[in-house]
Amino acid sequence: AEAYYRFKNNLAVVNVTSGPGGTNAITGVYGAWVDSIGMVVISGQVKWETTVRSTALPLRQYGDQELDIEELVKPITKYTKMITEPKSIRYHLEKAFYIAKSGRPGPVWIDVPADIQNAEINPKKLLTYKPKKIVKKICTLKLMVRSFYVIIQSNVNLGKICFFFG
């Protein structure tokens, strides 16, 4: 995924299994985090009902090869999410791809429990991610910067402000 991003300047998807598959991917994800490399990691997970999180018990592990990978990778990803509702899968995938590419690129991680992977989903009921508010803010900031530049440039041209470069 890192090499693909470096050569194509586009995201690659890494698909890993639960437990050790996720932990083995952490080194590469950390490298992507440090070097600002965008990538999307999708990991498998045991059924939601056999995760520690679903039980709220003070255990380290509940299901076979279960690991709360979300908590492990939060410090080295721009976005991480365990999918708990089948209808939210599209929303979180779209959000992950958007975040991985926006601003300073970086890795994102989506964890998908087995029961969510096997769920029947009505495509018409899938939630979608719409970052309109973020885009609007960026456009507003861009206009503010342009306006500021025009004011500075005008004052420089009038001799009111002197810049020294060197």
Regions found by a protein language model. Give the residues of each.
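N-terminal alpha/beta PP-like core and its mobile active-site loop of ThDP/TPP-dependent enzymes
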Residues: 1-166
